[in-house]
Amino acid sequence: PFKGDRIWKTENGSWIIVDEVLGKHEMITYAVAINSKGEILGIEIMEYVESYGYEIKNKEWRKQFIGKTANHPIKLNQDIQNISGATLSAKHVTDGIKRVMAFYDLALKSQ
């Protein structure tokens, strides 16, 4: 469930949502910025403490999400490339971002 104290609406109508997913053993905290059209503006990995898989923080990998909406698949190995050495982290973050976008579409888009 999303926590209200981790969801912000900006003055220009964009949203910032902070969420967590399980990596391999530890939680990954990330933020999704969504513009007023429902498009992802950016993804930021805020906390990653796993021993391996730090490639998840790679800017080039995160750029794949920019422009995606809730109507896009946002699925690993479909429209999002996987990361060798960070497979579980990449899958869980990708699935989490898809969940954030579904939440935005259902609960925030009309606000």
Residue ranges and their predicted role:
Residues 1-91, 95-111:
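Flexible, solvent-exposed loop/hinge segments and secondary-structure transition points
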